[in-house]
Amino acid sequence: MTDCKKESVQNDDLLNLLNQCDRCGACTLVCPLYEVNALDRATARGKLALAKAYLTGVLPEGGAALQEAMEYCLLCGACSEVCPSHIMTADAMVDMRHRLGEKYGLSLFHRAVGAGLASPGFRNLGRAGIAAAQALAFPKLTGGLVPADPVIPRTGHPGPAALHTTSPVETGPRSAEGLKNIAYFTGCAMGLFFPKAADASVRTLQAAGFQVDRPRVDCCGVPQLAHGLAERARSLAKDNIASLEPYDAIVTDCGSCANSLREYPHRLADDQDWALRATALAKKIWSLSELLYAAGYQPPHRQLRVTYHDSCHLNRGLGVHEAPRALLRQASDYIEMDRADRCCGGSGSFALEHPAVAKKILALKERDVRATGAQVLVAECPSCLMQLGKMAGKGLQVLHLSQVICP
């Protein structure tokens, strides 16, 4: 290794992170992938070792095999919760995907997902296509992704008023008092696959007394980061900051979007001006349940047995745990399930790329759900809903939180 190469390696922040792994194996106890496929490469320990071998030249060439290994991760963060060294494996995997993508190129699928969701035209076209397929009763065209309309009765509240269409920050306990001008951030998946749930979110926010605007926004950047398009994710972050800065608060009903928006300061840390703007914005980001709970919203009660699945980004990323449960306890006959925070196996496009593995992970989740006897399974993340929706039927509905707590 040349002196120049040695210096580059020694100054590599990612390598410094990888060097903290002592291969204790704590991650193997909580990794959803390892639980259904007991291979060391499935764990954080295995993937971090491969990444270190590549960066230090022990594994001189990566190529498609190494890319596949780095992509075989749900980015759920379960390993980081139990890691004695507090290694953020998800961050390491995202960094490696970007580096390998720059060197070896990205697959057509990953480029299509990243570029497509960043395109308003593509999202509009996709929304229209999905709506048409549903209207014509062609479920195969929508991939079985969208749960059936809820049978939960409405309580007679009027519909929404006309709407205008124009490293996570530590926020601590927050008050919703004084928040007037609220922006509802419509995530790509909510807009594409769950527009009725998105409308229910807005209706609920209005019932809680908020003035709600739906500004034109771009993708939050999570799909781009996950697929190695870091620079595109940075560009989207800047566009969204510019669009959302005027608002008192920004609320989203997608846990991944909320977590991504809060992480903009980290994403733009090397640009002082944008980092300052990102930090100011991050302090104004709320998840739907977080804001409604802080505002004291009282949902109508329905005689339904309901259980709740914690999305990884909302629970582990933002620490939102009690708010959705408090709302559901008021809105239903709530039942807590075992391992509610266990990843469902969806993780964006992971279930599409690894359907057999995702199916095994989902089966474990379904076992815990069915054990509660719940009629409705609730989540606050569209990616989770797309995965969990596959277990709907046999007396079980899968719904977004907003569809259960809306007026």
Predicted segments, located by residue:
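Cysteine-cluster motifs in flexible loop/terminal segments that predominantly coordinate metals
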Residues: 2, 24-28, 312, 347
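Non-heme iron-sulfur electron-transfer modules
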Residues: 1-7, 34-65, 86-114, 395-404
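N-terminal glycine-rich anion-binding loops that anchor highly charged ligand groups
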Residues: 26-29, 40-43, 211-214
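Cysteine-centered iron-sulfur cluster-binding motifs in ferredoxin-type domains/subunits
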Residues: 15-34, 67-87, 341
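Generic start-of-chain signal for non-secretory N-termini
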Residues: 1-19
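Iron-sulfur cluster-binding electron-transfer modules in prokaryotic oxidoreductases
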Residues: 10, 89-407
